Design a protein with these regions (language model features):
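Mid-to-C-terminal secondary-structure elements
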Residues: 33-34, 60-107
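Nucleotide-cofactor and metal-assisted catalytic machinery
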Residues: 5, 11, 26, 65-73
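Extracytoplasmic/periplasmic
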Residues: 1-3
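Mechanotransmission and gating elements of multispan inner-membrane complexes involved in transport
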Residues: 85-170
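The feature marks short, hydrophobic/small-residue-biased sequence motifs that occur predominantly
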Residues: 7-50, 93, 110-113
């Protein structure tokens, strides 16, 4: 098993030619990119081991819609509450992936969790969720139940099948 911290933030990527709504998935130094590496179609995995940087993975689907490629920079706007001016972040594409799951590919950009922490004014220990990976996929339900029993009642635990029901329903 492997546990990794993540935090997500909705945003809008704007280029000279297009714009797309996205979810920026912030991941930490402990993130296991092994599963994503097999879906890499160009470039490389971002280096999140050192200080905060702007390197991200973007899907082939989003890259095509936004006319972007590895090495390109793009601007992302993250909305603030109360109608204040949005936070802006420039990101650098180091890799392009194609997972084959349209729901995922049309939505997610993956980069440094510290951007989400800064935008949300969180501490460096604050995260949005923990992802728990199991060695045996057939035991995911039991692991999900075990986690649920151990967390405070104000938290929730769901399996990947529950989160992405439409992918697994077939």
């Amino acid at each position: 098993s492997h546990v990794q911290a993540v935090a997500s933030k909705a945003g809008i990527i704007r280029t000279e030619k297009a714009f797309e709504g996205i979810i920026y998935k912030g991941v930490g130094k402990d993130y296991n990119f092994t599963n994503l590496e097999e879906y890499l179609v160009d470039g490389k995995i971002p280096n999140l081991k050192s200080e905060l940087n702007t390197e991200v993975l973007i899907s082939e689907y989003l890259a095509k819609r936004l006319h972007l490629k590895v090495g390109d920079k793009f601007l992302t706007f993250f909305m603030k509450e109360n109608g204040k001016l949005p936070n802006k972040r420039n990101f650098l594409i180091t890799g392009i992936f194609n997972s084959g799951f349209q729901e995922f590919d049309a939505t997610y950009v993956i980069g440094d969790i510290r951007h989400v922490q800064l935008i949300n004014k969180w501490n460096s220990t604050d995260v949005g969720a923990f992802e728990v990976f199991v060695d045996d996929f057939s035991k995911k339900k039991k692991k999900g139940d075990d986690v649920y029993k151990e967390i405070p009642p104000t938290y929730n635990s769901i399996t990947i099948e529950e989160k992405f029901y439409s992918i697994f329903e077939w």
